């Protein structure tokens, strides 16, 4: 018996799973876009946790 020899089975991995990968990428970018839009609202623009606030790009109120 040959225990060290592996047999290559033609199992499709990428073909049935590509819709999930594409959906994951789309979801990631939609959440990133929503987070950026939320960071730039009036409610969160002057929050000290905002990266734009730390960089000195604070929106001044008139």
From Swiss-Prot:
It is a single-pass membrane protein. GO terms for cellular component: mitochondrial inner membrane; proton-transporting ATP synthase complex. It comes from the Eukaryota. The chain crosses the membrane at residues 13-32. It comes from Yarrowia lipolytica (strain CLIB 122 / E 150). The lineage of its organism: Eukaryota, Fungi, Dikarya, Ascomycota, Saccharomycotina. F-type ATP synthases have 2 components, the catalytic core F(1) and the membrane-embedded component F(0), linked together by a central stalk and a peripheral stalk. The central stalk, also called rotor shaft, is often seen as part of F(1). The peripheral stalk is seen as part of F(0). F(0) contains the membrane channel next to the rotor. F-type ATP synthases form dimers but each monomer functions independently in ATP generation. Belongs to the ATPase j subunit family. One of its GO terms (biological process) is proton motive force-driven ATP synthesis. It is found in: Mitochondrion inner membrane. This is ATP synthase subunit J, mitochondrial.
């Amino acid at each position: 018996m040959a225990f060290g020899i592996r047999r290559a089975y033609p199992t499709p991995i990428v073909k049935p799973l590509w819709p999930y990968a594409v959906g994951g990428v789309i979801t990631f970018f939609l959440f990133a876009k929503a987070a950026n839009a939320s960071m730039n609202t009036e409610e969160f623009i002057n929050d000290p946790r905002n990266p734009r606030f730390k960089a000195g790009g604070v929106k001044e109120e008139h």
